[in-house]
Amino acid sequence: MNIEELKIGDLVRVIKDDYIIQKGTICKVIGLSATDLSAFGGHKPVVSLLTIDTENIRSMSCENIEGIPLTKDILLKNGWKLLKHHERNSYDDVSWSSYHKPAETNISLVFYPEEEAFSLFLYAQEISETPIRYIYQLQHILFGLGLNSKIEV
């Protein structure tokens, strides 16, 4: 994962075991450093993590973390509701599901199965330049809009 993609507060998953944090552990980013020569033996970007379940703090290379896929279940757990579902009816048509958060009535997420990604809409206008596939991507957009970007996994 690239350090440029991350911000403090993002949720990520560890993909390589170390002696403190196990593979698959969900963590919150609490610090970012472009390089750390002492601990990692090179010019590798380093991220400081706080484990969600045990509240351990650990720094590790960005190579050892990945984004957590944004799923419909995670949206539902965080107060988003299925607003509308559309099935593909013709060759030119696409399937999609629209989700909104009642507390934030001006935003919605549309899931496109063909892309396996979401797009964010503000007042019915698409505002996400790239498909949203990971929790941290949604967190960045919500934060930029001044909305609550805290997400439970």
Q: Which role fits each region the language model picked out?
A:
Residues 12, 27-29, 47-49, 65, ...:
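Hydrophobic beta-strand residues in large extracellular and virion-surface proteins
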Residues 11, 19-36:
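Short beta-strand-centered aromatic/proline hotspots
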Residues 53-84, 129-148, 153:
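Intrinsically disordered, low-complexity, charged/polar segments
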Residues 82-113:
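Amphipathic, interaction-prone secondary-structure segments
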Residues 105-133:
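Intrinsically disordered, low-complexity regulatory segments enriched in Ser/Thr/Pro
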Residues 36-54:
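SH3/SH3-like beta-barrel fold
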Residues 1-6:
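Mixed-charge, Lys/Arg-rich low-complexity intrinsically disordered regions
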